Amino acid sequence: MQGITELLPISSTAHMRIVPALLGWQDPGSAFSAAMQLAALAAVISYFWGDVRDLLFGSLDALTRRDFSDRHFRLASWIVLATIPIVIAGVALSGVLNACNSPLRSLTVIGWSCIAMAILLALAEIFARHKRTIAEASLADALLVGVAQIGALIPGVSRSGSTLTAALGLGFKRAEAARFSFLLGLPAIALAGLKELWELHKVHLDAHGWSVLATGLVVASISAFFAIWGLMRVLERFSAWPFVIYRGLLGVVLLLGLAMGWLA
């Protein structure tokens, strides 16, 4: 479930709250969270390996040549700069976001967040020009999408949902918007994974625990890879409307479940 929903613009948090609530599952803990973040990172790097490779080696080559106008070096630099807003916001709000009794973690907030993002994504889909490519991106574009990542700190928004919406709003083609979103999100996903890995030092896993963690990482990586593949196919051939509809319905189901007592 987490592997599939982590990288889709449909909020993995909403799914990982509603399914355990319905089935009575317990919180899987930091080991599970670390595995999911690392799985997401592995999936994005493997799917967009051509872009990642070009950015890495192109930037290194540009540095040796001192060619700071090189397109690979510029994009890599912008990706780093675009990560700063969510790092600052994450550190500043960590006390509120990580508190067990934080109102932001309630199913009510998650439900309304799903609906709000469905509306914003719908507006982006309706009014966007869908003409630009990553080759036409600017520093301002990268920073705006980077700022949009802050929305991911609110449960129910989803990082891919907020950044895809921002990129579409800036006029990028649908598939290019998703590609831009994932590449810009690599440092944020990596930092989140490192944070969860740091939490693992508090967990004393035995051999069985590590084997379960490794299995979960592999399965989640594969499912996340195919989730990206599916997202790109939908955006290339159709539009973002399937995700708009799904998000909206998910938010309504969450709020109805709370009102009627299915969820708590």
From Swiss-Prot:
Residue intervals passing through the bilayer: 29-49, 77-97, 107-127, 137-157, 180-200, 212-232, 243-263
Q: Which GO terms describe its molecular function?
A: undecaprenyl-diphosphatase activity
Q: What is this protein called?
A: Undecaprenyl-diphosphatase 2
Miscellaneous remark of the record: Bacitracin is thought to be involved in the inhibition of peptidoglycan synthesis by sequestering undecaprenyl diphosphate, thereby reducing the pool of lipid carrier available.
Q: Which InterPro entries match?
A: UppP
Q: What is its EC number?
A: 3.6.1.27
The role this protein plays is:
Catalyzes the dephosphorylation of undecaprenyl diphosphate (UPP). Confers resistance to bacitracin.
Q: What class of enzyme is it?
A: hydrolase
Which Pfam families has this protein been placed in? BacA
| Gene Ontology process terms (BP) | cell wall organization; peptidoglycan biosynthetic process; regulation of cell shape; response to antibiotic
Any Gene Ontology CC annotation: plasma membrane
Q: Specify the species.
A: Mesorhizobium japonicum (strain LMG 29417 / CECT 9101 / MAFF 303099)
Localization, UniProt:
Cell inner membrane
> Which reactions is this enzyme annotated as catalysing?
di-trans,octa-cis-undecaprenyl diphosphate + H2O = di-trans,octa-cis-undecaprenyl phosphate + phosphate + H(+)
Q: What is its main location?
A: membrane
The answer, when asked if Cell inner membrane is one of the entry's keywords, is yes
Membrane-protein topology: Multi-pass membrane protein
The question of whether Cell wall biogenesis/degradation is a record keyword is answered with yes
Family, similarity comment: Belongs to the UppP family.
Going by the entry's taxonomy, the superkingdom of the source organism is recorded as Bacteria
Q: Which UniProt keywords apply?
A: Antibiotic resistance, Cell inner membrane, Cell membrane, Cell shape, Cell wall biogenesis/degradation, Hydrolase, Membrane, Peptidoglycan synthesis, Transmembrane, Transmembrane helix
